[in-house]
Amino acid sequence: MARIDNKYRKLISKKAIGKELKLLGNETKDIFDLNFEVAYLIVKEILNLERNSNSDLSEIKKRIQDNLKIPGRMEKINGPNKTTILNDSYNANPDSFLAAFEFISKLKYKHKILVMGEMGELGEKSDQLHDLVIQKATKHFDFIFCVDINSKIKSEKINYLSKSDIVINLSRFFDKQTLILFKASRSVKMETLIDLI
């Protein structure tokens, strides 16, 4: 996996907006870690569009959208009772959590729920960074379920649970007005929880 740094993300967004690729202009800034081949495809398609003004924009959008469908990266799943589930369990770090929160804040749902797993490889500041993310989450979510995380942050919105308790606690929220974001580092295997729903 490769991280697209800010310089290239800005370049891609600028070119996308300039070419009215709304898919890129509005959404790519919220995707922080992209598969390198997908990043390459986006740049290649934009350059092709610049060289050939007769390019079919809808076909380019479709190719990019198809390649952006990476399991575990803001993958939309239809849950029980038409609940919207976003599986962002492929990887996690503080920046990607905050970007996901910003993205979620723009969506219109009656209930927004975060199921948060541990962020790996944060070193000595791990507890502090988890606390920071949890604190920020309280501003964007109605309920937060922290899976196997120890934190000092207290709030009526926050529940600290084990994996085995999550599904039972989530089931009362299943309806079409609810969005549930699952996000954690890959090592947490959050997709195993999603599979139980």
What role is predicted for each listed range?
Residues 1-197:
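ATP-dependent carboxylate-amine ligase
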